[in-house]
Amino acid sequence: MLDIKFVRENPDVVRQNIRNKFQDAKLPLVDEVIALDLRNREIKKEVETLRANHKKASKQYGALRAQGKLEEAEKLRAEDAASEERMTALSAEEKQVEADLKQKMMIIPNIIDPSVPIGKDDSENVEVERFGEPVVPDFEVPYHTDIMESFNGIDLDSARKVAGNGFYYLMGDIARLHSAVISYARDFMINRGFTYCVPPFMIRSDVVTGVMSFAEMDAMMYKIEGEDLYLIGTSEHSMIGKFIDTVNKEENLPYTLTSYSPCFRKEKGAHGLEERGVYRIHQFEKQEMIVICKPEDSMMWYDKLWKNTVDLFRSMDIPVRTLECCSCDLADLKVKSVDVEAWSPRQKKYFEVGSCSNLGDAQARRLGIRVVGPDKTKYLAHTLNNTVVAPPRMLIAFLENNLQADGSVRIPEVLRPYMGGMEKMVPKK
């Protein structure tokens, strides 16, 4: 959410930003917001004047009564009563105007960074850099669920009976590998100075609207019936929410946290669910990282965060590349975002395994995450988030890139302590 003062003083900048995101239907919102803001300020000014007059009238009324000027006193009292009725009406209008203003402000997208490429969809995202040499083996790489099934490691049919499409049972060595990757990612981030945290897996609606746009909320979040609670789509939601309505000392920044959680997503929208496979599903587990920092440090942390993911994947011998997300591919709260994609030997192309985002002060403004400096000046923090690792997408990349010609899967050295020293997984069938 933008600062209303910024919108008031820079309406053309806001309009051009909307055009750059190809959201022209939102252009009328700018004039609507400016009109509501003007009316809101007019109301406040009139209420302030009426309150001052009321205070003055109260003193005059007492003085007139003391002087025996009862007729004048009653006339003044009647006038003041009319002013009080006006204040009551204005207060009700003010409440409605502020609610309408906030609702419209939350729909206007954040101002994207000037470095973001302008594009209409994710096909116009721009490759930034490749890490590791993509390998195409001289044998056929099976579909990822076929690899898992060769280890008796996945049961989609039973999961479908129990919960419907978009769920799975992982078993045996595949389940063990899943846990090993999560544990390794946790320790990887701890060793890089991040504080480990296991957050709440449900959050209230005020936190939901604080961390994401209405469009994201509708497409992703599961609501608990009869409760003001939602299942988290990523632990970023509850981790950023941890700082709601806080004033943080500048000397304590940055806060760097890495968190584990299950994640729940409706996956409503253009992509939908895969009928076969575990690439896009309703439930998965993820290791996340978030940063709360000073505004001038957020771009530095942005680069550090996505590099952590690249380093993690490269430590497991998985080639990756980074893609700069274009303007239309950015969610409305994001200032800048990069996708990390892993190499798929089977498809002979890269696919998304994580995303790093700088949200500027958008989440901080919605949630009231403030910082107080040495001179007692208060300002909004900047927030960032990044995927450390998200099985089962990570498992797809891992299995394909470490698969051997005999059907076994090599375990990279960094994962062996988490797999009981196992050097390779041998198929059961």
PLM region spans:
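N-terminal alpha-helical targeting/anchoring segments
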Residues: 1-134, 149, 153
